[in-house]
Amino acid sequence: MEQHTSHPNRKVPAKEEANAVPLCRAKPSPSYINLQASSPPATFLNVQTTKLPSVDHKPKECLGLLECMYANLQLQTQLAQQQMAILEHLQASVTQLAPGRGSNNSSLPALSPNPLLNHLPQFSK
């Protein structure tokens, strides 16, 4: 099953597609009906006999999902930083085009250096 990251009607430059980082594929989850058919009904009598995973138990699926989420957060952070750099460059260009206008009279608000990125959590692996 081929999955495309871009919208079919949107033209994406070849350079952008070449630099694209593939996201982790999602695993299909069973439907509610499949769960009901494959598992016994939970009642007050058999709830106590249900084995719960221990605290140290970490299924491979969960670790894979966490690693995927971590990689996606890293990618989103990188994209946000690139977008802020583009906005700062755009603001500098607009300022150079209109040097006679004072910053107090400008219709564009001044951007402080990376206002959003200062509040992003720092992830470490």
Curated annotation (Swiss-Prot):
The keyword Chaperone belongs to this UniProt entry's keyword annotation: yes
Keywords: Chaperone
GO molecular function: protein-folding chaperone binding
Entries under InterPro entries matching the protein: SSTK-IP
Pfam families for this protein: SSTK-IP
Region (Disordered): 1-21, 97-125
Gene Ontology CC: one annotated term: cytoplasm
UniProt biased composition (Low complexity): 103-125
Top-rank taxon, per record: Eukaryota
Assembly, per entry: Interacts with HSP70. Associates with HSP90. Interacts with TSSK6; this interaction is direct and recruits TSACC to HSP90.
Function per UniProt: Co-chaperone that facilitates HSP-mediated activation of TSSK6.
Family affiliation: Belongs to the TSACC family.
Name of this protein: TSSK6-activating co-chaperone protein
Organism: Macaca fascicularis (Crab-eating macaque)
Source taxonomy: Eukaryota, Metazoa, Chordata, Craniata, Vertebrata
Gene name of the record: TSACC
